[in-house]
């Protein structure tokens, strides 16, 4: 008996740009052969707002309020790279206390970023309960931000060229320490619910595998790179801010699949807690609301009086632990030159390339968004996957379209 050969025509379907699993206004044009993905074309640009051109018409200080809208889940990192790049171009050293405060904000933002990734990712693969748990912890982080900056999610506008906008309020360090003590067991709770859940593991293990060579060749960064066997973290590599003062480990894995990327982000939250706890104990000046009032600063003090009062307050004889009157800089005239500056955000390497011609505004301001680069590998790892796995693989990348489109 002869068998009839059946052939199926390729089917082209659109995911997004308004699908709830798209994590923003992302459109995927997917070509299917039955249930197998043959090709995928990401269509971006729906959220483009010309952030680079806006930066070229603003000074460094006046541009800081805009940057929270790149990656609106990690606004502190956007502010950090904006001021760090300007400080590096100006050869400006910031007070030690300000650097510690920045680290506190950045690590809180890293935890908030991973929590916001974890909940929707699990919802994408069918686990609804943890989606509601993560908002409980994120609200506590927002409370801490609100106490310092007055804002919760975005528009913190807290980082400044040369330091931060204001000192920590009275009692904030104690509240942050309470959060660290409370959040540690919650990570264990997540792992009990998720990590060894057989349904969850069978759903994502082996999906979206990226080898070590592929991760390097595609210029991946962050958890996407570290989950593929490359222990690369800019906090260790570039030694920016005061990360060298703390004892912590790089979270990485070798498998390169969706499950490995999940494990890396869970471990990164633990390491962020380690950094936070150490920074809370080691911060110069201690838990104070007003350093000037605590040290008895007066406008008639001489330089010797100022140095003596600073040494009394910090317990140090010398050193730039904190500075009430920092080095005077002309923010209306940025030094001529060009440089590339980068920080390790929750999604990977967030960089800025600046070209300055000596005027107040930069001549060129190029943003290197981590999730924009990470998204480029999506068609490669989707080819050959099932249509039901598209959302799981996309979710493991962790993209925010405000950052991708800029």
Swiss-Prot record:
| Keyword field | Membrane, NAD, NADP, Organellar chromatophore, Plastid, Plastoquinone, Quinone, Thylakoid, Translocase, Transport
Q: What class of enzyme is it?
A: translocase
Q: Report membrane topology.
A: Peripheral membrane protein
- Keyword rRNA processing present in the record's keywords: the answer is no
Q: Which reaction does it catalyse?
A: a quinone + NADH + H(+) = a quinol + NAD(+)
User: InterPro entries annotated for this entry?
Assistant: NADH_Q_OxRdtase_suD, NADH_UbQ_OxRdtase_49kDa_CS, NDH1_su_D/H, NiFe-Hase_large
Signal peptide range: none
**Subunit details for this protein?**
NDH is composed of at least 16 different subunits, 5 of which are encoded in the nucleus.
Q: What is this protein called?
A: NAD(P)H-quinone oxidoreductase subunit H, organellar chromatophore
Species of provenance: Paulinella chromatophora
Which gene is transcribed and translated to give this protein? ndhH
